[in-house]
């Protein structure tokens, strides 16, 4: 059942998962929000109970946001940074915090609120939880990435992560620096009780995600090595998944529901 209004009955006995979508680009507004099949796996948890608390799912659309420097078209080789103002990612963090406050004001205990996101939404989840984990129960970052298909474009499987980042910094020095700044800020967290799902064949940050393991509290899970999970072929709808970046939206990913519920 879909409730388009922000209504939570018996809020003290609810667990709220806030679902954040990916982005078509890093900093500009977009016409799209959630794609087909995006909800299926998290929606499969709705109405299940954990310690007599019922799970609900809230889909937060922030696709219309744009960063303060978006008009400057800063994704270019001669942009040196630093970024002036708030990025779209920062504004998405703020939107989540506003929603969290509304839910808490309605009576939902803060530790029963969880933030999750895919791709740029997963990157944003890391940004939010690293600074505001006191306001929620935890987070789930799914194939987190927001700076392009770095792993594929720069052939990470052949040259290694360090060489990929060197080439990226040479081509887009300011952009690469902005990514590094965000990673450094996320790594400042002293305890980050979140799940971080990655896949080695993800064309975005598939082989560039080891840094997240340095953060205390993070449980990194490598989804699979291929396009099966526990012997089950991964599909989105009726189509086989061929892009590992989308494997967290495939039916096979529900294998991890018990892990998520923990």
Indicate residue ranges for each PLM-predicted region:
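Short, surface-exposed "cap/lid" segments of acyl-processing enzymes
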Residues: 6-49
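A domain-start/cap signature at the N-terminus of enzymes
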Residues: 1-14, 55, 157-160
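Primarily recognizes the serine-hydrolase "nucleophile elbow" in alpha/beta-hydrolase
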Residues: 102-105, 111-159
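C-terminal catalytic histidine-bearing segment of alpha/beta-hydrolase fold enzymes
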Residues: 216-262
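Conserved alpha/beta-hydrolase
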Residues: 47-74
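Alpha/beta-hydrolase active-site loop
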Residues: 74-106
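Active-site-adjacent alpha-helix of alpha/beta-hydrolase-fold enzymes
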Residues: 34-49, 198-236
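The feature captures the conserved acid-bearing segment of alpha/beta-hydrolase catalytic domains
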Residues: 146-224
